[in-house]
From Swiss-Prot:
<feature type="repeat" description="HEAT 5">
    <location>
        <begin position="395"/>
        <end position="430"/>
    </location>
</feature>
<dbReference type="GO" id="GO:0005793">
    <property type="term" value="C:endoplasmic reticulum-Golgi intermediate compartment"/>
</dbReference>
<dbReference type="GO" id="GO:0072384">
    <property type="term" value="P:organelle transport along microtubule"/>
</dbReference>
<keyword id="KW-0968">Cytoplasmic vesicle</keyword>
<comment type="function">
    <text>The coatomer is a cytosolic protein complex that binds to dilysine motifs and reversibly associates with Golgi non-clathrin-coated vesicles, which further mediate biosynthetic protein transport from the ER, via the Golgi up to the trans Golgi network. Coatomer complex is required for budding from Golgi membranes, and is essential for the retrograde Golgi-to-ER transport of dilysine-tagged proteins.</text>
</comment>
<dbReference type="GO" id="GO:0006888">
    <property type="term" value="P:endoplasmic reticulum to Golgi vesicle-mediated transport"/>
</dbReference>
<dbReference type="GO" id="GO:0005783">
    <property type="term" value="C:endoplasmic reticulum"/>
</dbReference>
<dbReference type="GO" id="GO:0009306">
    <property type="term" value="P:protein secretion"/>
</dbReference>
<dbReference type="InterPro" id="IPR013041">
    <property type="entry name" value="Clathrin_app_Ig-like_sf"/>
</dbReference>
<keyword id="KW-0472">Membrane</keyword>
<dbReference type="Pfam" id="PF01602">
    <property type="entry name" value="Adaptin_N"/>
</dbReference>
<keyword id="KW-0677">Repeat</keyword>
<feature type="compositionally biased region" description="Basic and acidic residues">
    <location>
        <begin position="1"/>
        <end position="11"/>
    </location>
</feature>
<dbReference type="GO" id="GO:0006886">
    <property type="term" value="P:intracellular protein transport"/>
</dbReference>
<dbReference type="GO" id="GO:0030126">
    <property type="term" value="C:COPI vesicle coat"/>
</dbReference>
<dbReference type="Pfam" id="PF16381">
    <property type="entry name" value="Coatomer_g_Cpla"/>
</dbReference>
<protein>
    <recommendedName>
        <fullName>Coatomer subunit gamma-2</fullName>
    </recommendedName>
</protein>
Length: 873
């Protein structure tokens, strides 16, 4: 049963767990000892420990065997041994879901719960509530009410916490105990007060007014429990976030007053709450930052760590607010706790001046090898932010990152470094060759397939444009010889890009491709054969379409369309235009540190927002036969934030139609809305075909209604339109407490903001990694050029942002970033116009008195070119 360990096992440490080799059948056999008389508490205790151990290890107990063991265990209530009795309570809780007829112990537990032994009463309450269902709850309601207000803190806390668990099961019954919970909230015991506040909040959390009243009551009367204060701060900050209240709110005043509390945990909780408030100004942050600054010099390591970690987060959005703490943070660089020292340095990197960068980097180098991977990632993210702030310091950063790349470390750490180097390369063209050289060195000995393929993709994209592209060929082909199938396939794709862009390298690349065609893996052979045939044609249009820019369709959409095509055999070839386009990737930098993922498994391809919309809309019968969804806009608010109804609109564009999805929320708890629709009146030749109303709109439960509109067929250039919108509905008054509506109702309407349809709603962003190749591929058959003057625009940055947002196209080659101190700039934009027509825009901008723009548009359709130029004009 329990293996006897020899000396070797003891020395290796494998014998440290005496329950390691337990067998369920043997333990259940031993459980028969429970039926013996007299009861042996020590032996029974040991067997119960084994049963609980097996249950917690995930061992499966059949219903019959679990029930038999449970019934045998109930005999142990005859013993008066305190430890054995409390072990019985634990076993009851563990076996409550797997045994039958567990309610047979109800009388024993009720007896202990109401008995004189205080040591039994709390655990008995917890065990009883674990086995009680909704039908039995009323039978113990009287005992629970008494226990909540009991003078013994452990009993009261047990009853309160058990009540909190039962709220999910029987909310209406537990709600009747609110008076007792309020009495417990005035207890002198800090844990009882905390648990009582928690129960009161969960009973009232769906009623904002009741929660506000509760907060006002306790802020006036005061609390003795620091835990309760922390919960109050969290509730107050949640309310502030929901109501979008500012620093003039009484709730904010309460949180700020907690900064002067005598308990450190309350002070920190208040500071943390203020720091994490959205749209918090520097003035509102100041008192919280002052408190955190004091904590930086605390003798307690936990407080120093909490302070510097929170200041680190503040520095991401408000670096100037943390500048006052720089001296305190400098002192923490030499802290004996490496985690604190790391956070101090990364915070200084965000708040420090350009002149302090070199010194800080040297200090990090002295101990970076001693800290964990998690904190190394934090350091790398701080360096990445610093590179954007001080681009001239990229050489110092690059050397530091290359040294870190050579050190040992896990996948997340290495990925953070690679991402940082790639961002430096993209932001600073002069650092490209140095960065690529470091990455080439890294993939020579890289055990992470994901990183190797990512770097090979970057080499294929950036390498051919460097002055000496041939030097990268060796590193890439080494991957074909030495690596796994996925890396070999990525290397073949990278090689093809060198051959397509550099005529001098083409013969050498073709020789290497021939070798790759002999590979043992299907994917590698197929890619090599495909690229070989494309490259041999020596046609720029083919290279652009099949090597540089590739497909720009949704992968999930392609999979579904192909599956549908195979289910319905057809003589016609598969049409790629039936597949929804992929939405362009979001490349903006995150402002917050993401938690380090522990999983190294490849993530399953998640459906995009547009894939989800496509599925939702295709399920509505009125929208059948519209074809693939072309584009979905971001939500547009049609009401103010604090109005009785909140309405936002998402515009879904198809080839010849638009669907307007109105997401409506009713914020009045005394009304039920029915047959809700938004009536639309267009200003142009758009035609409203059909309305799909929302059947019911109860209080605080969002619902959607739809309007189907046909686009103008006679004038393809008529893309812009303004709709006046009115929400129409049937109102039925209802009881705010029960939600029961009246039998009768009346029609009403609510005027919404006007809704604009612009040229951006007809264009889907598509990223072209190689814009020049795409420009040649489209050709100049449908090309037009015009010059415009923007008299009111004063900077190139502003002009670029205006053009990008207005046209709704994807900036390529990072041309949306205007270099400093430049008077001219070229912006490249790519997209697909509704109907599947490629459209490319090259805008040459010059700064003089205002900004002058020369716009050149190429497309596969003349009408699209006219639409773009007309909209810009």
């Amino acid at each position: 049963m329990i293996k006897k360990f020899d000396k070797k096992d003891e020395e290796s440490g494998s014998g440290s767990n005496p329950f390691q080799h337990l067998e369920k059948s043997a333990v259940l056999q031993e459980a028969r000892i429970f039926n013996e008389t007299p009861i042996n508490p020590r032996r029974c205790l040991h067997i119960l420990t084994k049963i609980i151990y097996l249950l917690n290890q995930g061992e499966h107990f059949g219903t019959t065997e679990a029930t038999e063991a449970f019934f045998a265990m109930t005999r142990l209530f005859q013993s008066n041994d305190q430890t054995l009795r409390r072990m019985c309570y634990l076993t009851i809780k563990e076996m409550a879901n797997i045994s039958e007829d567990v309610i047979i112990v109800t009388s024993s537990l009720t007896k202990d719960m109401t008995g004189k032994e205080d040591v039994y009463r709390g655990p008995a309450i917890r065990a009883l509530c674990r086995i009680t269902d909704t039908t039995m709850l009323q039978a113990i309601e009287r005992y629970m009410k008494q226990a909540i207000v009991d003078k013994v803190p452990s009993v009261s806390s047990s009853a309160l916490v058990s009540s909190l668990h039962m709220v999910k099961m029987s909310f209406d019954v537990v709600k009747r105990w609110v008076n007792e919970a309020q009495e417990a909230a005035s207890s002198d015991n800090i844990m009882v007060q905390y648990h009582a506040l928690g129960l009161l909040y969960h009973l009232r959390k769906n009623d904002r007014l009741a929660v506000t009243k509760m907060l006002n009551k306790f802020t006036k009367s005061g609390l003795k429990s620091p835990f309760a204060y922390c919960m109050m701060i969290r509730i107050a900050s949640k309310l502030l976030e929901e109501t979008e209240g500012g620093h003039d709110s009484p709730l904010f005043d309460f949180i700020e007053s907690c900064l002067r509390n005598k308990h450190e945990m309350v002070v920190y909780e208040a500071a943390s709450a203020i720091v994490h408030m959205p749209n918090c100004t520097a003035r509102e942050l100041a008192p919280a930052v002052s408190v955190l600054q004091l904590f930086c010099s605390s003798p307690k390591a936990a407080l120093r760590y909490a302070a510097v970690r929170t200041l680190n987060k503040v520095a991401m959005k408000h670096p100037s607010a943390v500048t006052a703490c720089n001296l305190d943070l400098e002192n923490l660089i030499t802290d004996s706790n490496r985690s604190i020292a790391t956070l101090a340095i990364t915070t200084l990197l965000k708040t420090g001046s350009e002149s302090s960068v070199d010194r800080l980097m040297k200090q990090i180098s002295s101990f970076v090898s001693e800290i964990s991977d998690e904190f190394k990632v934090v350091v790398v993210q701080a360096i990445s932010a610093l590179c954007q702030k001080y681009p001239r310091k990229h050489s110092v950063m690059m050397n530091f990152l290359s040294n870190m790349l050579r050190d040992d470390g896990g996948f997340e750490y290495k990925r953070a470094i690679v991402d940082c180097i790639i961002s430096i390369i993209e932001e600073n063209p002069e650092s490209k060759e140095t960065g690529l050289a470091h990455l080439c060195e890294f993939i020579e000995d890289c055990e992470h397939t994901v990183l190797a393929t990512k770097i090979l993709h970057l080499l294929g994209k950036e390498g051919p444009r460097t002055p000496t592209p041939s030097k990268y060929i060796r590193f890439i082909f080494n991957r074909v010889v030495l690596e796994s199938e996925a890396v070999r396939a990525a290397a073949v794709s990278a090689l093809a890009k060198f051959g397509a862009q550099n005529d001098d390298l083409l013969p050498s690349v073709l020789v290497l491709m021939q070798r790759c065609m002999m590979d043992s893996d299907d994917e590698v052979r197929d890619r090599a054969t495909f690229y070989m045939n494309v490259l041999q044609q020596k046609q720029k249009a083919l290279n652009a379409a099949y090597i540089f820019n590739g497909l720009s369709v949704s992968v999930l959409g392609l999979e579904k369309s192909l599956h549908q095509y195979t289910l319905e055999p057809s003589e016609k070839p598969f049409d790629m235009k039936t597949v929804p386009l992929a939405t362009a990737p979001i490349t903006e930098h995150k402002t917050e540190i993401a938690p380090v993922a522990t999983s190294k498994l490849p993530e399953k391809l998640a459906p995009s927002r547009q894939d989800i919309y496509q599925e939702q809309l295709s399920a509505i019968p009125e929208f059948q036969g519209l074809g693939p969804l072309f584009k979905s806009s971001e939500p547009v608010q049609l009401t103010e934030a604090e109005t009785e109804y909140v309405v936002r609109c998402i515009k879904h564009t198809f080839a010849n139609h638009m669907i307007f999805q109105f997401d409506c929320t009713n914020t009045l708890n005394d009304q039920l809305l029915q047959k809700v629709l938004v009536q639309m009146e267009p200003s142009e030749s758009y035609e409203v075909l059909h309305y799909v109303p929302a059947a019911n709109l109860p209080y605080s439960q969002p619902g959607s209604c739809y309007s189907l509109v046909r686009l103008p067929e006679d004038d393809p250039t008529a893309v812009s339109c303004t709709f006046s919108c009115t929400m129409k509905y049937l109102v039925r008054d209802c009881d705010p407490n029960t939600g029961e509506p009246d039998d009768d109702g009346y029609d009403d309407e609510y005027v919404l903001e006007d809704l604009e349809v612009t040229v951006a709603d007809h264009i889907q962003k598509v990223l072209k990694p190689n814009f020049a190749a795409a420009w040649d591929e489209v050709g100049d058959e449908c090309e037009k050029e015009e010059t415009f003057a923007l008299a009111t625009v004063r900077t190139l940055d502003e002009a670029v942002n205006n053009i990008v947002s207005f046209l709704g196209m994807q900036p390529c080659e990072r041309s949306d970033k205007v270099p400093e101190n430049k008077n001219s700039h070229v912006l490249f934009l790519a997209g697909v116009f509704r109907g599947g027509h490629d459209v490319l825009v090259r805008a040459r901008l010059a700064l003089a008195d205002g900004v002058t723009i020369q716009v050149t548009v190429r497309s596969t359709d003349d009408n699209v070119v006219d639409v773009i130029l007309a909209s810009v004009g």
